Amino acid sequence: MSKCRKTPVQQLASPTSFSPDILADIFELFAKNFSYSKPLNNEWQLPDPSEIFTCDHTEFNAFLDLKNSLNEVKNLLSDKKLDEWHEHTAFTNKAGKIISHVRKSVNAELCTQAWCKFHEILCSFPLIPQEAFQNGKLNSLHLCEAPGAFIASLNHYLKSHRFPCHWSWVANTLNPYHEANDDLMMIMDDRLIANTLHWWYFGPDNTGDIMTLKFLTGLQNFISSMATVHLVTADGSFDCQGNPGEQEALVSSLHYCEVVTALTTLGNGGSFVLKMFTMFEHCSINLMYLLNCCLDQVHVFKPATSKAGNSEVYVVCLYYKGREAIHPLLSKMTLNFGTEMKRKALFPHHVIPDSFLKRHEECCVFFHKYQLETISENIRLFECMGKAEQEKLNNLRDCAVQYFMQKFQLKHLSRNNWLVKKSSIGCSTNTKWFGQRNKYFRTYNERKMLEALSWKDKVAKGYFNSWAEEHGVYHPGQSSILEGTASNLECHLWHILEGKKLPKVKCSPFCNGEILKTLNEAIEKSLGGAFNLDSKFRPKQQYSCSCHVFSEELIFSELCSLTECLQDEQVVEPSNRIKCLLVGFSTLHNIKMHIPLEVRLLESAELTTFSCSLLHDGDPTYQRLFLDCLLHSLRELHTGDVMILPVLSCFTRFMAGLIFVLHSCFRFITFFCPTSSDPLRTCAVLLCVGYQDLPNPVFQYLQSVNELLSTLLNSDSPQQVLQFVPMEVLLKGALLDFLWDLNAAIAKRHLHFIIQREREEINSLQLQN
């Protein structure tokens, strides 16, 4: 008998067991496909390159009418509570049960809505050219791919059907680990990314932004080992919650860059899948005409598992004619690559045949009709849904599951055939970021009102009270202890990653995104992004912070306790006098207790006087100073010694790398925050206990990093060192948890100062009035 019994998957009835009206609804749900049948006279031809980018954008009235009528219906949703509306539409979604059933029944890896959508596309169109099967090799490129569900879906499709080909893939997305990226623009789920980083290309600047010409050039070099690219997918979009009626216009530049990248990299006869939304505007019409001229077949497809009430569609393009056929035009289009497309239109009106416009209008009307019907029906059911309608919806959802499984013939895949058979990373940003990205607790109108509030109004209305109150009772360090383990630091496999200097730190895999975002807003709105500590933020005599400051005596008491623990474990010989290196301090104050340690001072006044700013610990000057102090300290330490090291914050990969090195050469690391009453200065210290020696190759590697830092700073280079320890190493569970605790304590301390000061000023003004 098997020791491990699998949870049985619920047996499903045949679709034919449902009533004809239920079946008719489900057939229609799975039939949202429109094909561009080309005219026999072959009049859909690309214009002469001299005609592109010569005219202004001029919209077509017929398409604008469709856009306006759709937005009129969308506007009816503006006063709906987002959490209530999403709960409602989740229930009315006829395909709502498919994802969970697929996940359980076929053991699908990273089974998300995107996984199911792409599986529908794979099973509905001949995406993989016959050449790939004939040659036994398939190459695919996936743009804007996070979290990687298209790749996981394709892997399941190939492995479960046992297609006779070796598959290689390369993917791109906005780098979830790059500090200058905005987390609102990204999908912060890195379950696949963290374990397959070698196959992800983030461009020469490491941001992952495809909307630069340097990215396109770099990508071509990155995939140069692929003889031909058979399939390109592009699943990009922006968060358009702030302006849903203009989604098409907001993503037009991204779609342009995705299309140019695909046409530049795709091999002859290859396939291209592009996510689009409504296609009413001139820029979208031009791209659709371009694709119809460059590929033999173009289909617009809305998968059943794509929510019926949104504008999302997938443009499926088959049998690419090749770069040679469009080379002169493609070269000119490449010059227009970037975030800000030229104000001129790709094609003037007169080069687009009426036959194409007619066919495109039919396509837009086709999907417009389905979307309007869905939104209107959802509004009707939101206001009143009886038991009969609930029962019908449940039947529809059950039938959709049956139909999906029968139509696409999904097969079970063992975990041994997954892309990530066993995660090498104990904890990734996914588990930390879960639930943070979208907080649907306000209506669209309420969110617009909140955006309109000034920073001072938000403070006055108490929007940030929870941060200050939570910080007031927060006692970090007492439970945040990072235990070191003997590990082989394979620094010969590491490499130093350079990139463009960070303008500010917006994102960090080592901190709660909401806290960092709020702190940045506080710095920017309250302090203008910089501090003048001699004036505005020098505390007045009567100003005091309600949070407790940890004294030097308390810190040394904790240090001695941890040292005694090591002696009890016989890690340190009791007879040896332990040295305590105090970094960055010129003297000791107010210590009345007996310290059974040999205390030595390593002065570095600058290290403790750095102020919090929008750059945080991303300032290369601070990073060089911190590393320099660390290298000097390590030369002084012997086995069993301890060190107290002040730290500004650890939001960046660079600083996280240094904490990892400390983690590797000390038995325990903990922290105390706040340790200073100075506003917005360095307010945390690391207690590093039980030095275990740092291998010489690692020390030499750190020296080379330090030398590069100095060279870049002295030459006023536009580059800086972004990373020197692999992300796979930095995302291990215990280290990641420790960094989250440390950064939360530091950020909340700074927020407390700013918000409390703002409150004082507001109260003072109110008293004067």
UniProtKB/Swiss-Prot annotation:
This is Cap-specific mRNA (nucleoside-2'-O-)-methyltransferase 2. Residues 109-322 form the Adrift-type SAM-dependent 2'-O-MTase domain. It catalyses: a 5'-end (N(7)-methyl 5'-triphosphoguanosine)-(2'-O-methyl-ribonucleoside)-(ribonucleotide) in mRNA + S-adenosyl-L-methionine = a 5'-end (N(7)-methyl 5'-triphosphoguanosine)-(2'-O-methyl-ribonucleoside)-(2'-O-methyl-ribonucleotide) in mRNA + S-adenosyl-L-homocysteine + H(+). It holds the Pfam family FtsJ. S-adenosyl-L-methionine-dependent methyltransferase that mediates mRNA cap2 2'-O-ribose methylation to the 5'-cap structure of mRNAs. Methylates the ribose of the second nucleotide of a m(7)GpppG-capped mRNA and small nuclear RNA (snRNA) (cap0) to produce m(7)GpppRmpNm (cap2). Recognizes a guanosine cap on RNA independently of its N(7) methylation status. Display cap2 methylation on both cap0 and cap1. Displays a preference for cap1 RNAs. It comes from the Eukaryota. Disulfide bonds: none annotated. It comes from Pongo abelii (Sumatran orangutan). GO terms for cellular component: cytoplasm; nucleus. It is found in: Nucleus; Cytoplasm. GO terms for molecular function: mRNA (nucleoside-2'-O-)-methyltransferase activity. Keywords: Cytoplasm, Methyltransferase, mRNA capping, mRNA processing, Nucleus, S-adenosyl-L-methionine, Transferase. It is an enzyme of class 2 (transferase). The keyword Nucleus applies. InterPro entries: Adrift-typ_MeTrfase, mRNA_Cap_2O-Ribose_MeTrfase, RNA_MeTrfase_FtsJ_dom, SAM-dependent_MTases_sf. Gene3D superfamilies: 3.40.50.12760. The active site is at residues 117, 235, 275. S-adenosyl-L-methionine binds at residues 148, 167, 235. GO terms for biological process: 7-methylguanosine mRNA capping; methylation. Its EC number is 2.1.1.296.
